[in-house]
Amino acid sequence: SNAYRTTGVDANIVNMTYKEVKTLDAGSWFSDEYVGENVPSLKEVLELTQGKIKLNIELKPADNGTALAKNTVRLIEKYNMVNDCVITSFSESVLKAVKTYNQEIKVGYILSAAYGDFYDMKNVDFFSVNAAFLSKRTIDAIHNSGKRVYAWTVNNKESIKNLTNKGVDGIITDNPVLARETIYSRDTSETIVNMIRYVFNQ
C-alpha cells in the first residue's frame, strides 16, 4: 500500500519502518484542522474505537501474510473486539490464516471483478465486490451460496439506491454521510433501509 494519497509521500508502507511511518502527516489531505496528525497504528485504532464502532480491517500482505494475520487476530482478541471487527483482503491465503487463528472472526474476500464460481470459496463469510461487476444475477448467486455481498466503492446516491435495490447486503463508501442520508431519505424504500448495514448487522 502506498502512502501518497493520504500523506503526500510516494513510498510503500511495506518498505518503511514503524518510526518512519509515524513521522508522516496523515491529516493535511483531509482538513487543515488535522495538520500534523500521525498515521495511527492498529493498536491505537482499537484503543480509540473499542465499544464505540465496528471496524472493517483490510489486510494487504507482502511476504508476511501469516504473521500479519496472526498479529492482527491477537490484537483484536486483546481488545475483545472479535464481534466488532471483520477482516477483508484480496489474499485468500491471508483469510485462511485468520480463520486458523480464530474461527469466530468474520472474513471477506475482496474482488476487483466477479467471474466464475468464486462464491463457492471455503473459509470466506462474505464477498466485497467492485460495484461495477455486481449484477442482480451475481448477487443472487452469492446469496444462494449462503454468503453476503458488499459493494465497493460507491460514492453517489443513484448507485447506492441501485445496488441496494439489487439486493446487496451493504455498501462500502468514502462518503458515509451521503450514504446514510440516501438510505434514510424519504424517497428511499423501507426495503433498502432494512438491507443496508455497512458490512455489519446493526
Residue ranges with predicted function:
Residues 1-106, 129, 143-145, 199-201:
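Metal-dependent phosphodiesterase/phospholipase catalytic core, i.e.
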Residues 32-36, 108-202:
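C-terminal active-site rim and adjoining tail of enzyme catalytic domains
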